[in-house]
């Protein structure tokens, strides 16, 4: 099945079962584009979708745990929205500063969504080996056993576009 066919299947059967996708591949091959296409289609059918970069997700998780003076009610509720939305998209996993706290909070987020049968799409430039080395065995195990994993191959579209312009 092609990358776009895979995404169409995910969208067409979204309400039938919770599915999780992990897109990995080099920079600029279209992972974020694919996640945004899925998001647009699901938003058009009145599903709730939250798109966050991994860096922004970690920021929200830190604010939820430790709080800060700049937090308002919407920031406080964001953690609950992350867990409850129909589709959570975590873009560029591996770009955030990783430590024990981040790993534990990421595990909490992934695991709670799995238990609630809520769909998640994760994109990363890391290889599967790098994911395994960067994150805990518990996170990697859940990704491998509960996510449909797709390697996205191709040339860097942004570089090709810049060269042709």
Name every feature range the model reports, one short phrase each.
Residues 15, 43, 114:
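Conserved ATPase "switch" residues in P-loop NTPase domains
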Residues 1-21:
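Pre-Walker A (pre-P-loop) alpha-helix and adjacent loop at the N terminus of AAA/AAA+ ATPase modules
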Residues 4-5, 18, 43, 47-84:
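Short glycine-rich substrate-engagement loop in P-loop NTPases that contacts/grips substrate
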Residues 33-46:
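P-loop NTPase Walker A phosphate-binding motif
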Residues 17-35:
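Walker A/P-loop nucleotide-binding motif
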Residues 47-48, 84-87, 116-122:
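Loop/turn-to-beta-strand initiation segments
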């Amino acid at each position: 099945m092609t990358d776009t066919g895979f995404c169409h299947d995910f969208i067409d059967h979204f309400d039938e079962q919770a599915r999780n996708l992990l897109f990995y591949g080099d920079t600029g091959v279209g992972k974020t584009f694919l996640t945004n296409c899925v998001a647009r289609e699901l938003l058009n059918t009145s599903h709730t979708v939250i798109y966050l970069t991994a860096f922004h997700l970690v920021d929200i998780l830190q604010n939820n745990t430790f709080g800060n003076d700049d937090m308002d009610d919407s920031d406080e509720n964001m953690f609950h929205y992350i867990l409850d939305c129909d589709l959570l998209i975590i873009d560029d996993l591996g770009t955030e500063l990783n430590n024990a706290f981040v790993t534990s909070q990421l595990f909490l987020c992934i695991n709670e969504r799995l238990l609630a049968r809520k769909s998640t799409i994760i994109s990363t430039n890391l290889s599967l080996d790098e994911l395994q080395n960067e994150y805990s065995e518990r996170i990697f195990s859940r990704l491998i056993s509960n996510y449909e994993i797709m390697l996205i191959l191709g040339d860097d579209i942004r570089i090709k576009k810049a060269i042709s312009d």
